[in-house]
Amino acid sequence: MSVLVPMVVEQTSRGERAYDIYSRLLKDRVIFLVGQVEDHMANLAIAQMLFLESENPNKDINLYINSPGGAVTSAMAIYDTMQFVKPDVRTLCIGQAASAGALLLAGGAKGKRHCLPHSSVMIHQVLGGYQGQGTDIQIHAKQTQRVSDQLNQILAKHTGKDIERVEKDTNRDYFLTPEEAVEYGLIDSIFKERP
């Protein structure tokens, strides 16, 4: 399926310049994470963050998230880059931030993590499905548990909740309204209008 990306035209001293909407917003330091978190999305988001850091290491990067989650390894690559780059990464949930999306939302700079009023946030444990020999399944189960523990530690760090509480809450799908996400410590505020 082909998707039409809107173009915007800007007047410059040298005439008109046409941009696709996402390139134009990137000039304003806005990155979109929309849809399943996977390797291609992670590659683009990481490249954009590194580019914006090289352009101005002292100006915030704005990460708009509308994601049902996805591949943990891709999410961890984005998360690690968010922590690695010098600029603060502001996060804003614009629809849903579930699973890996919630991890990225919470991983924004403290005081700069937000939701729009009708957004939804969901945390849960790592999902995995494996087949094969019993020993291979055991190996994958141990790896899944290790990654799950790692993600719970990250959520505990960013929310200020103790690890036991995070483990209990991520044991099943745990949905939060924006107000509940503020109380939990996943975000810092709800944007009801542009600040």
UniProtKB/Swiss-Prot annotation:
This enzyme's EC code(s): 3.4.21.92
Gene Ontology molecular function: ATP-dependent peptidase activity; ATPase binding; serine-type endopeptidase activity
Active site: S99, H124
Superkingdom of the organism of origin: Bacteria
One example of a Gene Ontology biological process annotation: protein quality control for misfolded or incompletely synthesized proteins
InterPro entries recorded: ClpP (IPR001907), ClpP/crotonase-like_dom_sf (IPR029045), ClpP/TepA (IPR023562), ClpP_Ser_AS (IPR018215)
Top enzyme class: hydrolase
Subunit structure, as described in the record: Fourteen ClpP subunits assemble into 2 heptameric rings which stack back to back to give a disk-like structure with a central cavity, resembling the structure of eukaryotic proteasomes.
Function per UniProt: Cleaves peptides in various proteins in a process that requires ATP hydrolysis. Has a chymotrypsin-like activity. Plays a major role in the degradation of misfolded proteins.
This protein's record includes keyword Ribosomal protein: no
Reactions this protein catalyses: Hydrolysis of proteins to small peptides in the presence of ATP and magnesium. alpha-casein is the usual test substrate. In the absence of ATP, only oligopeptides shorter than five residues are hydrolyzed (such as succinyl-Leu-Tyr-|-NHMec, and Leu-Tyr-Leu-|-Tyr-Trp, in which cleavage of the -Tyr-|-Leu- and -Tyr-|-Trp bonds also occurs)
Gene for this chain: clpP
SUPFAM superfamilies membership: ClpP/crotonase
Organism of origin: Coxiella burnetii (strain RSA 493 / Nine Mile phase I)
PANTHER family, A to Z: ATP-DEPENDENT CLP PROTEASE PROTEOLYTIC SUBUNIT
Protein name per its UniProtKB record: ATP-dependent Clp protease proteolytic subunit
Family: Belongs to the peptidase S14 family.
